[in-house]
Amino acid sequence: MGQKINPLGFRLGTTQGHHSLWFAQPKNYSKGLQEDQKIRDCIKNYVQKNIRISSGVEGIARIEIQKRIDLIQVIIYMGFPKLLVEGKPRRIEELQMNVQKELNYVNRKLNIAITRITKPYGHPNILAEFIAGQLRNRVSFRKAIKKAIELTEQADTKGIQVQIAGRIDGKEIARVEWIREGRVPLQTIRAKIDYCSYRVRTIYGVLGIKIWIFVDEE
């Protein structure tokens, strides 16, 4: 049997970079890791509550965290940053306050910056949110995947593979369905592949979505 490995971890140091950049003593490492998770969860929850476009996409591609002794720099890569900034210019400050309250920092400064992504639908996280929104609205899974593949084609990607597992379309027996378009060379380390796994709650139960996007070869 072929062993499945996470494509991002497999390519760390070649085509993929780390999303958290900091150093810690071995005994404090787990604490730093939990801190990162709290920051990411807090940001995602805030965005979920405050912005949603009609398709159900929050638009966060990834969150990078850089830590120094006195400063934590958080960079949010978003596909649709206007949604967070428009209407309420103080939203970023509010978000900063929320995260600071969650982590109760006293002597550490927190700085949040938002970076816009040029082709949002070329990122698996945003695409998974789009498919999840469609499945929640009871759109048939094939239709949802086809639409997602069309969106990635506009983003100049070389290939995409989408897999959905669970009680698809409310069927009694859970199954796994997948569709591939173009090339997705998972064995090639120099191939830059973006990947995400996403859970979506529907009225029939939980579905798992996995997306592999072949961006380019280095």
UniProtKB/Swiss-Prot annotation:
Coiled coil: none annotated. GO terms for cellular component: chloroplast; cytosolic small ribosomal subunit. Residues 47-118 form the KH type-2 domain. GO terms for molecular function: rRNA binding; structural constituent of ribosome. Keywords: Chloroplast, Plastid, Ribonucleoprotein, Ribosomal protein, RNA-binding, rRNA-binding. GO terms for biological process: translation. It comes from the Eukaryota. The keyword Cell membrane does not apply. It is found in: Plastid, Chloroplast. Pfam families: Ribosomal_S3_C. Part of the 30S ribosomal subunit. Belongs to the universal ribosomal protein uS3 family. This is Small ribosomal subunit protein uS3c. It comes from Vitis vinifera (Grape).
